[in-house]
A protein has these predicted regions:
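Noncatalytic alpha-helical scaffold of FAD-dependent oxidoreductases
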Residues: 2-563
């Protein structure tokens, strides 16, 4: 059956305009083309490659500039005690830092208590779950300044927390007690770019979206993409080994990062900014800093291999009746789209309901209700070839009744709108009050079962319901199906000890039994430190601690977290 005719049997004429508009664009395309990629698709626009809006329009830090209403981490977890090895801050310490960094490089509430309000955004995380007591934020402007600051802190036993865009989700980028915050926000230089090899060298404080915009002007793209791209720093991305939306196509940062520049706790500058794809000379030490979450040193510079920006990009948003059908769709996508498949995102009905509730005026990608939704992206160099492959795939999955309904972006605006809808889930989840987040990897056949079992667990404890008397409101799941990465989210009206006890270690035990990972891409931070044993055996954890003690014998780097 012809694709257009087949789709015509599925979509009502009255729905077609909404489907074509894909939340924002207004066209007069005939209804018969509502579920196909037209000649005006974003794929035909060379500069449109992955030009979607993320949550960058919402500055993750400054929308919550005052976080004094967040419970202190030390109060939420009273069993945690400040390490007595660390010295308290003094006026003499502050004077030294101002001498090195200048007045503009220091936010000081030690000698100027009125500045505490300016420090609060650095003390709290955007999830409103963790909040420290820091009275000092240092903002070095160069690697050499980072070196001087760290050496002094190490010599005087001052604990530090490296901080990038502070978009982390596990409490890894904010203080627990009175640690000194070392913000990389002033280190924003793009040092060099080779437009033949695609090698980019940047300061750690360069914002991900700024780097991608710079590359777009030169026909390249950054091989990492996430919803926080408008705020997160590349140094933070590397330090947490962020995964994101492009991992299916471009792999992890362990493969794309060519070199790092880092400062060790004793002030030693590690200059390993290799620009070569091949360098088999000795131990690959840069890998230790990728995903170390600032516990071994501070990443100050990154060299990374960037691919050509695809000239042809297509995005489809599909509705499916079950998780089993989503699995079938993914298998077909890998088989039929193969080399042009760049993203395959999974969303359940609960996550979509929350987005619609928080954004009632936003246009929905699909009018009908479905149990599951998938966003599929293809990217390549030949628009005609890619469009034909995508149309053939969609015709096939509709014919096999794998997919119930769907829409394909007709232009750049619609590509942007569909991705914005997907990426808006994270922000919308927090509007009820708070979120317990679990970023996990599970074998695909059982991936969504964790969501259902977690919901059952909370129901059995009487902790979840529609009224305000219940602390938990919703259990939803979404994530990157392309790399078996589930984001399990429990939206709560308030953080509650009973909810946390019901979830932990239940979730981690469930994952461990299926040989999954308790942290797929968000890291360990404070949230998962004590649960690392569910994914790493005693030998592995012991080796990690040996590495930590070798690099940071005084333990000043991001204490109380990771391992």
């Amino acid at each position: 059956m012809a694709f257009k005719a087949q789709v015509g049997s599925v979509l009502r004429q009255t729905e077609a305009a909404a489907l074509r508009s894909a939340r924002g664009a207004r066209t007069t395309t005939p209804a018969s083309t509502a579920f196909r990629t037209s000649t005006k698709t974003a794929a035909a626009v060379p500069t449109a490659a992955r030009c979607f809006s993320t949550s960058s329009a919402r500055p993750w830090r400054h929308t919550q500039a005052r976080r004094a209403d967040i419970t202190r981490t030390s109060e939420r977890y009273p069993d945690m005690k400040r390490d007595s090895r660390f010295a308290p801050l003094t006026r003499e310490h502050v004077a030294y830092f101002k001498e090195v960094l200048g007045e503009n490089g220091v936010i000081d509430a030690v000698t100027d208590p009125a500045s505490q309000a300016d420090i609060e955004p650095f003390n709290g995380d955007w999830m409103r779950k963790y909040r420290g007591h820091s009275q000092l934020v240092l903002r070095p402007g160069s690697t050499e300044e980072v070196s001087k600051v760290l050496k002094y802190c190490n010599d005087h036993r001052l604990a530090v927390v490296p901080q990038g865009g502070n978009t982390g989700l596990v409490g890894g980028s904010v203080p627990v007690f009175d640690e000194v915050v070392i913000s990389m926000s002033r280190m924003q230089t793009i040092r060099s770019f080779d437009d033949v090899s695609g090698t980019l060298v940047v300061d750690a404080g360069v914002v991900l979206e700024a780097a991608d915009t710079y590359l777009a002007e030169r026909g390249y793209l950054f091989p990492l993409d996430l919803g926080a791209k408008g705020s997160c720093h590349i140094g933070g991305n590397v330090s947490t080994n962020a995964g994101g939306l492009r991992l299916l196509r471009y792999g992890s940062l362990h493969g794309t990062v060519l070199g790092v520049e880092a400062v060790l706790p004793d002030g030693t500058i590690v200059d390993d900014l290799c620009k070569l794809r091949k360098n088999n000379t000795g131990y690959d030490l840069k890998q230790l800093f990728i995903g170390a979450e600032g516990t071994l040193g501070i990443v100050t510079g990154v060299s990374i291999a960037c691919p050509q920006r695809p000239a042809a990009v297509n995005v489809a948003f599909l509705g499916l009746s079950s998780y089993e059908q989503a699995l079938r769709a993914f298998r077909e996508a890998k088989s039929q789209l193969s080399e042009i498949l760049s993203a395959f995102e999974l969303m359940d009905a609960g996550s979509q309901h929350i987005v619609r509730t928080v954004r009632p005026d936003a246009r929905r990608p699909l009018d009908g209700e479905h149990d599951f939704y998938c966003l599929i992206e293809t990217s390549g160099s030949n628009a005609e070839h890619d469009t034909a492959k995508l149309e053939a795939f969609l015709e096939d999955v509709m014919g096999k009744e794998i997919v119930e309904d769907g829409v394909v972006a007709q232009d750049e605006t619609q590509v942007k709108a569909l991705w914005t809808w997907r990426e808006g889930i994270t922000e919308c989840l927090g509007h009820l009050g708070g979120v317990y987040k679990y970023d996990v990897s599970i074998p695909l056949p059982e991936l969504y079962q964790l969501v259902e079992d977690t919901r059952t667990q909370l129901e059995s404890k009487g902790l979840i319901g529609e009224s305000d008397e219940f602390p938990a409101a919703k259990v939803v799941g979404y994530g990157h199906m392309g790399d078996a990465n589930l984001h399990l989210n429990i939206a709560v009206r308030r953080y509650d000890e009973a909810v946390e006890k019901a979830l932990e270690p239940f979730v981690y035990e469930w994952i461990s039994k299926r040989q999954g990972s308790i942290s797929a891409e968000h890291g360990l931070g404070l949230a998962k430190k004590k649960y690392i044993g569910y994914s790493r055996n005693e030998t592995m954890v012991g080796l990690m601690k040996q590495i930590k003690n070798t690099f940071d014998p005084n333990g000043i780097m991001n204490p109380y977290k990771y391992i």
